[in-house]
Swiss-Prot record:
Record function comment: Catalyzes the CoA-dependent transfer of an acetyl group to maltose and other sugars. Acetylates glucose exclusively at the C6 position and maltose at the C6 position of the non-reducing end glucosyl moiety. Is able to acetylate maltooligosaccharides.
Protein name according to UniProt: Probable maltose O-acetyltransferase
Source organism of this protein record: Bacillus subtilis (strain 168)
Residues marked Transition state stabilizer (site): 84
Catalytic residues (UniProt): 114
Amino acid sequence: MLRTEKEKMAAGELYNSEDQQLLLERKHARQLIRQYNETPEDDAVRTKLLKELLGSVGDQVTILPTFRCDYGYHIHIGDHTFVNFDCVILDVCEVRIGCHCLIAPGVHIYTAGHPLDPIERKSGKEFGKPVTIGDQVWIGGRAVINPGVTIGDNAVIASGSVVTKDVPANTVVGGNPARILKQL
């Protein structure tokens, strides 16, 4: 049975990101994001838009504008999580963010990747790897979380870090690439 490009994308296989269905879904997400980013803070419409855009949203989740993502429906955020402004989540695969997380301004979370081989990359195909962020994680400003990374519970990611590998629970990591600085 042939798989759709969307099914390939969700499975982390090479897929054509210019597929018509995917183009329409990204366009729909951009429309919701634009509305979200332009809606006043005290407006209940913002919560409604967030629930329409994302795969799941826990109780008392705050995402400050501006916020950007590819599709939205791959993003799942737990209760009492705060996402500061200028967050970008490229969600071609699942992104799970736990409960009681703090995400500082300008954090980027990427699930999208491209083939290293230049001929394959020229084809326009890409792939994704999921990102999982545990409970009570604090990600500092301008940190970058790369595809396929899992961050354990209670971890702290220092500002400006580039996280390329899994982060154990109860650790502080920092640098480019991020490395363990301290056990908590």
